[in-house]
Amino acid sequence: ACQASQLAVCASAILSGAKPSGECCGNLRAQQPCFCQYAKDPTYGQYIRSPHARDTLQSCGLAVPHC
């Protein structure tokens, strides 16, 4: 199930470009199928589409989704 709240541990990485934690990467991996849904969400979309979000995904070894 998609739970955007699980991405809260990634907030500092997504907002400031800080190195993501292991917990952040694990949660991103689990939520990966939901990224496009989040990108379209008015609340979360601006964060998911930000350059730092891309960097965070790449730091975790995850592909940046093409929605």
UniProtKB/Swiss-Prot annotation:
One of its GO terms (biological process) is lipid transport. InterPro entries: Bifun_inhib/LTP/seed_sf, Bifunc_inhib/LTP/seed_store, nsLTP2. The keyword Transport applies. Gene3D superfamilies: Plant lipid-transfer and hydrophobic proteins. SUPFAM superfamilies: Bifunctional inhibitor/lipid-transfer protein/seed storage 2S albumin (SSF47699). GO terms for molecular function: lipid binding. Keywords: Disulfide bond, Lipid transport, Lipid-binding, Transport. Disulfide bonds join C2-C34, C10-C24, C25-C60, C36-C67. Belongs to the plant LTP family. B11E subfamily. Transfer lipids across membranes. May play a role in plant defense or in the biosynthesis of cuticle layers. This is Non-specific lipid-transfer protein 2P.
